[in-house]
Amino acid sequence: MLKRTQQRVLILPLAFAGLTFLLHLISNLFFRYGYFRDEFYYLVCGDHLAFGYVDQPPLIAVIARVTRTLLGDSIVAIRLPSALAGAGLVFLTGLMARELGGRRFAQALACLSAVVAPVYLIGGNILSTIPFDQFWWTLCAFFVLRLVLTDDPRYWLAIGATVGIGLETKHNMAFLACGIVAGLLLTSNRRYLRSRWLWIGAAIAVVIALPNILWEIVNGWPTLEFVRNASGGKNAHVSPVAFLANQILSLHPLTLPVWLTGLVVCFRTPRYRLLGCLYLVPMLIFMATQSARPDYLAPAYPVLFAVGAVAIARAAERPHRMWVSSAAFVPLALTGLLLMPIGLPILSPAKMEALTARLTGAGVNDPSREQGKTAQLPQYFADQFGWPELTAEVARVYAALPPADQAKAV
């Protein structure tokens, strides 16, 4: 049982996590558009379980299969695990702020930053690998933070397990692993290279990820071919400057002071430099590819929200600085409400189309679009329309085929 003091300090992270879950639940119950295109694919993958697929590891298919078996295949049902993952990310963000010594305001600011970020709202509202990838990155960052704060090398076991599960969710986790390795080599944490716990943790990660690795080897590394083809023919070209601009937009512009403060504090504080590497190294890799979507780096921000929120809260505690807390929290909360339709389908299609037109006219384009194409709605919303009509058309054509052709139709 948690002690009463422990229960009190968990109230805010739990409250914000609950709010996040309710936002997703309500939007899918009352304001949803339709199934997102990739959701059909993941459901089909769930019907054909394997140790890997061309474009993702196996865990999302398992999640789809279990969810469909237990809850059915309604939009609300299949998106429930994603909503839980999004809520878990918010909870861990507040928990990290608490671990850093942050009081109520610091925890609230860290959580609010995660709640209002459109990239997390979008991810938590669709069945895909994205919200689970974001959750595993955040959980791994939490364990790294605990390692840094306690100097207990046994946390490498939890880090290794989380990396392994993350690699079975989305190969994006490999970039976080690169950040951990760089942080070990470039900071005083290289002393852990002599710890058996580090190597046991690394072995745990490899063992968990091994089924998918073997599948890739046996099938000739199809995911690498998929990534190459996507970079050259599917994903839009993104310059380093545009990539950073997309980060600011997808995380909500007013969270910039929070996570940027967190990044500065990480590298100015020797103890936290390993945490800074969890962000900086993946960022440099994604910028170098010039084809990475904003959501690729999004999982690296919760720990920066936590560090930055604690630093801002401490600045607000100084004499004549009480205004800092209001200046940081109130505008973020208000604009978070105003920008919520960007992340959740709470407007009618016509109103969302009008909002998209206004944003495009102001020079704010959908950063998730492929090959720079623009549309009347953001791509993650536009691809939730037209499926009933397509189904009806396919059924009509199929019914018109001779019986012999129907038997051969796929």
Question: Residue spans of the language-model regions?
Answer:
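Transmembrane-helix signature of polytopic, membrane-embedded enzymes
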Residues: 2, 13-14, 93-116, 134-135, ...
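Short helix- or helix-capping micro-motifs
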Residues: 17-20, 110-115, 163, 167, ...
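Transmembrane-lumen/periplasm boundary regions of multi-pass, lipid-linked membrane glycan transferases
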Residues: 31, 174-271, 287-290, 341-345
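Transmembrane-helix motifs of polytopic, lipid-linked glycan transferases
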Residues: 80-101, 139, 143
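Specific aromatic-rich, kink-prone transmembrane helix
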Residues: 92, 132-150, 155-163, 307
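Membrane-interface transmembrane helices that cradle and orient dolichyl/undecaprenyl
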Residues: 98-101, 140-156, 261-270
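Short acidic/glycine- and proline-prone juxtamembrane loop motifs at membrane-interface regions
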Residues: 119, 125-133
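Signature aromatic-anchored transmembrane alpha helix within multi-pass, membrane-resident enzymes
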Residues: 315-358
